[in-house]
């Protein structure tokens, strides 16, 4: 299934350190040649300061059991630089520890004033803290790096040349330490910055494309992520446009989120539209499963695609944890759609489709109807399942209306903003004609 593997393309939009979990995950699969994969990991890790990881990868490649002199020297240099940076920042960090116990840390301006007044804080100290945070990150010490990055965020002005780098670094470090709540906060902060920054159209598109890929890691690991990924990828026009323009393969993750989110079935209609629009640029078993089921009503095709979906998900680092849930919810979708179209279906036919015994299938269907709150009845004597009409609840109708209006509002806001920028640029260009 290498033709459906997205690791190579996803890694193009991830920080080097964020690619390591994906590459190590692939090492446990039989998709690529293990030797070539380890060589690529070694090539990538050599560009960092993670000397121990480099040595471990060399051992896995049977290159050497002893650390080469070059690596010994490099490790000594890394430790020396780290010590120097820590010494430069130590006085300020000691002051920060003292101030943590007071109320000043809660307010950025008060905190900076206290540092300047009582501890002779200067811009050079901030630069040193930034360098140390970045160096710790390059060494793979992500947890300690987050402390210095947090300090930089409190002290730095959003206009600082390094502010955007700190936002990206903080998000990456929180992802790598699996702090999903904080990672979501950092993701939201970074998205707000990107959406409000004065980037060119190309720069904004690039920033959003990177953010989309990083956010997938957060969304599939955070309890609220399944709703948030739908809101961001499907109902925020700027991000949907970025997906359609730069990374249509992200449709896999959006489709997966909709399938496993039973409370957001109202998003299916909008998702199917986008899948059909992008079908000429990207297709995979997950998007094709939804097309088979909701566009072509090809139930046999959907059943076959579901089998392929299992293989795809099993080999995708981002969504492998959703495998069982995806299969269960996909079966539910097949059942719902099939029964609503045919209205009356024999239990034996469903049992055959589900690879179950008739009595097991009947119990499964009873529980399914009860849990999914479907309007259906089972005639045990005739062995039939009879489906009634399933009206859309007022709540679902309201959610659909809100999503639709929100999407249109954002689209209009984007148009107004672009026209305003064009007008400003035109006025600026015209002003030069007088000189």
From Swiss-Prot:
One of its GO terms (biological process) is translational initiation. It is found in: Cytoplasm; Microsome; Endoplasmic reticulum. Pfam families: eIF3_N, PCI. It comes from the Eukaryota. Disruption phenotype: Homozygous lethal at the first instar larval stage. Larvae are smaller than wild-type and die 3-4 days after hatching. One of its GO terms (molecular function) is translation initiation factor activity. Residues 219-392 form the PCI domain. Keywords: Cytoplasm, Endoplasmic reticulum, Initiation factor, Microsome, Protein biosynthesis. One of its GO terms (cellular component) is eukaryotic 43S preinitiation complex. Expression levels in females and males are relatively similar 10 days after oviposition, however by day 15 expression is higher in gravid females than in males (at protein level). InterPro entries: eIF3e (IPR016650), eIF3e_N (IPR019010), PCI_dom (IPR000717), WH_DNA-bd_sf (IPR036390). Component of the eukaryotic translation initiation factor 3 (eIF-3) complex. The eIF-3 complex interacts with pix. Interacts with mxt. PANTHER family: EUKARYOTIC TRANSLATION INITIATION FACTOR 3 SUBUNIT E. Component of the eukaryotic translation initiation factor 3 (eIF-3) complex, which is involved in protein synthesis of a specialized repertoire of mRNAs and, together with other initiation factors, stimulates binding of mRNA and methionyl-tRNAi to the 40S ribosome. The eIF-3 complex specifically targets and initiates translation of a subset of mRNAs involved in cell proliferation. In addition to its role in the eIF-3 complex, also functions in protein ubiquitination and degradation. Belongs to the eIF-3 subunit E family. This is Eukaryotic translation initiation factor 3 subunit E. It comes from Drosophila melanogaster (Fruit fly). The lineage of its organism: Eukaryota, Metazoa, Ecdysozoa, Arthropoda, Hexapoda. The gene is eIF3e.
């Amino acid at each position: 299934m290498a033709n459906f593997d997205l690791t190579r393309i996803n890694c193009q939009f991830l920080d080097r350190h964020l690619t390591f979990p994906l590459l190590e995950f692939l090492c446990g699969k039989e998709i690529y040649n293990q030797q070539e994969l380890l060589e690529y990991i070694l090539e990538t890790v050599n560009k960092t300061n993670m000397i121990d990881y480099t040595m471990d990868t060399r051992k896995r490649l049977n290159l050497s059991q002893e650390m080469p002199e070059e690596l010994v020297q490099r490790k000594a240099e890394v430790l020396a630089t780290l010590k120097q940076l820590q010494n430069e920042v130590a006085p300020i960090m000691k002051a920060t520890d003292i101030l943590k116990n007071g109320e000043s840390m809660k307010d950025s301006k008060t905190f900076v004033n206290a540092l300047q007044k009582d501890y002779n804080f200067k811009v050079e100290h901030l630069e040193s803290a930034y360098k140390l945070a970045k160096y710790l990150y390059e060494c793979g010490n992500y947890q300690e790096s987050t402390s210095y990055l947090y300090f930089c965020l409190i002290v730095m002005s959003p206009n600082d040349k390094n502010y955007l780098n700190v936002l990206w670094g903080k998000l990456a470090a929180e992802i790598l330490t699996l702090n999903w709540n904080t990672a979501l906060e950092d993701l939201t902060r970074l998205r707000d910055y990107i959406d409000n920054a004065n980037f060119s159209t190309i720069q904004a598109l690039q920033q959003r494309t990177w953010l989309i890929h990083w956010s997938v890691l957060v969304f599939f690991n955070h309890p609220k992520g399944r709703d948030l990924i739908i809101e961001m990828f499907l109902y925020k026009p700027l991000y949907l446009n970025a997906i359609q323009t730069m990374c249509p393969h992200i449709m896999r993750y959006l489709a997966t989120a909709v399938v496993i989110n039973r409370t957001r079935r109202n998003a299916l209609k909008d998702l199917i539209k986008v899948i059909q629009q992008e079908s000429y640029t990207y297709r995979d078993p997950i998007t094709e499963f939804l097309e088979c089921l909701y566009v072509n009503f090809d139930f046999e095709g959907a059943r076959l695609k579901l089998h392929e979906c299992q293989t795809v998900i099993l080999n995708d680092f981002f969504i492998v944890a959703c495998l069982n849930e995806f299969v269960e919810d996909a079966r539910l979708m097949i059942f719902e759609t099939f029964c609503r179209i045919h209205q009356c279906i024999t239990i034996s036919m469903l049992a055959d489709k589900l690879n179950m015994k008739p009595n097991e299938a009947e119990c499964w269907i009873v529980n399914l109807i009860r849990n999914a709150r479907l309007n259906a009845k089972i005639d045990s004597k005739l062995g039939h399942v009879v489906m009634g009409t399933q009206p859309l609840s007022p709540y679902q109708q309201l959610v659909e209306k809100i999503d639709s209006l929100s999407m249109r509002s954002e689209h209009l806001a984007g148009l107004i903003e672009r026209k305003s920028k064009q007008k400003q640029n035109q006025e600026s260009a015209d002003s030069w004609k007088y000189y």
